[in-house]
Design a protein with these regions (language model features):
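Active-site microenvironments in enzyme catalytic cores
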Residues: 22-228, 236-239, 255
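Short, basic/aromatic beta-hairpin or loop at an interaction surface
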Residues: 89-90, 188, 229-240, 259, ...
């Protein structure tokens, strides 16, 4: 009997050790920055940035943001790619209206009919969990033929600028476990005022393969620096991002004036310990349970009415918005 008890204790210890390893194990592959040609900002010109005809976003493009959101990384896969509504564009000193629960319910219904009614019942006072994301964006200065994207030496003509990829995280969470998960991301980033863009874009005199302005970008909320990172730490080049967009949206033409937001560094309000995410997945928590857990946790770093938010980049200008009711 003692021998059986001993075997049982050993089995229990092994099971606990296995669970702990599952919860805290590191990423199988650590993300690393791409290799860039760093432009000299003195060798270029500034031009007005027009409101885009179409806009895309790339997610999880900095290692720090992958870690803080407990996301996975596949170096051979395509990162999150989503569309943003051009109608969400605003400029510096604009008011950023905090979405009401009804606005969130309507946005949820637009992407998944009936979801809004579920949210009205379960979360009548739903918070948007409003978040900030400083990003270096780029605009296409010419139409791009998809066949050009397969040439590693292709140097698309781009203009670079600063943007704030504002997000309603409560909507994004609802995509958990859905095959079209990143459509929910796009919806969460396309509410009115959710794409503050700088007024001007910087363009190099000569386009170089994998060329970008290697500059420091940051988000400041009420005078506090929340994000600060060099664009040189991006995991993907603009050419790779355009390939990803074409792979996910092959029917969409990459026309002149298209805007791409290249991803945000670490420091956003939406952070989750990796072990907690894995534990939730282990127990099969539904997306609504995950949303409830996030709403019940500390939400003090999410944006509130009265907050003044500036996204800026060295040599690329800035865009400031104020959250209003």
């Amino acid at each position: 009997m003692r021998r059986n008890m001993g075997f049982g204790l050993v089995a229990l210890a092994l099971a606990v050790a296995g669970l702990v390893y599952y919860l805290v194990r590191p990423l199988s592959v650590e993300p690393s920055p791409a290799e860039f040609h760093c432009y000299d900002l003195d060798d270029g010109v500034y031009a007005p940035l027009e409101t885009p005809g179409q806009a895309f976003g790339i997610g999880l493009a900095y290692a720090g943001h992958i870690r803080e959101t407990a996301s996975e990384f596949n170096p051979d896969g395509i990162p999150p790619v989503f569309t943003k509504s051009p109608q969400a564009t605003v400029r510096t000193d604009a008011d950023l209206r905090l979405p009401t629960p009804d606005a969130l319910f309507d946005a949820a219904d637009a992407i998944e009919p009936g979801l809004g009614d579920t949210l009205r019942s379960d979360f009548p006072n739903l918070s948007p969990l409003l978040d900030y994301e400083v990003e270096m964006g780029f605009v296409l200065l010419e139409d791009i033929d998809p066949s050009q994207l397969n040439d590693p030496t292709f140097s698309p003509k781009l203009g670079f600028f600063i943007a704030n990829d504002v997000s309603a995280r409560s909507l994004a969470i609802l995509g958990e476990g859905k095959p079209n998960r990143y459509d929910y991301w796009g919806a969460s980033k396309s509410l009115p005022g959710f794409m503050p863009l700088a007024d001007k874009a910087w363009t190099p005199e000569t386009a170089e393969p994998n060329g970008i302005p290697c500059v420091e970008i940051e988000t400041i909320v009420n005078g506090e620096v929340r994000q600060h990172q060099s664009t040189e730490d991006l995991i993907y080049t603009p050419l790779q991002m355009l390939r990803f967009i074409h792979a996910e949206f092959p029917e969409v033409a990459l026309d002149e004036g298209t805007v791409v937001l290249s991803g945000t560094p670490g420091g956003v309000a939406m952070t989750t310990p990796r072990w907690l995410v894995r534990l939730g997945n282990l127990f099969g928590l539904s997306r609504l349970k995950k949303l409830s857990a996030k709403l019940g946790a500390d939400t003090s770093r999410f944006l509130r009415v009265g907050d003044r938010v500036t996204a800026r980049g060295q040599g690329l200008g800035k865009v400031t918005v104020t959250v209003v009711p």
